[in-house]
Design a protein with these regions (language model features):
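Extracytosolic ligand-binding ectodomains
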Residues: 1-113
């Protein structure tokens, strides 16, 4: 959980009377990345945005993400969940087993700049 996620869930529920889906969080993350890059670059110039985004950290509903400098891949922690046997409510489905930090994920760099 984080403040951005809490806000997104509350606003989505208020506006659409339903929780956000997976795609909503992804779109929100993309918008957060764009806003962070524009703020950091101080410009909409392509080369300045590229320089600003390489290695840039930005907040998302799923936690911090980082654009890897080597290939511009967005990296984030992954979450290992277990489905709960006993659920306290309609959306009380998962139990977090562990968080796997992005730094521990062996995603190869194939397309170097």
């Amino acid at each position: 959980k984080n403040k951005m996620n809490d806000w997104l869930v509350a606003e989505h529920q208020k506006r659409f009377n339903a929780p956000p889906d997976f795609f909503t969080a992804g779109g929100f993350a993309a918008a957060s990345a764009a806003l962070t890059a524009l703020t950091k670059a101080g410009s909409s110039d392509t080369e300045k945005l590229i320089a600003a985004m390489e290695g840039m950290d930005f907040d998302t509903p799923k936690g911090k993400m980082t654009f890897r400098k080597e290939d511009h891949q967005a990296m984030q922690s992954m979450y290992h969940f277990r489905i709960k046997k006993a659920q306290a409510g309609e959306w009380d489905l998962l139990e977090l087993v562990r968080e796997i930090p992005a730094s521990e994920l062996p995603v190869p760099v194939r397309n170097k700049r």
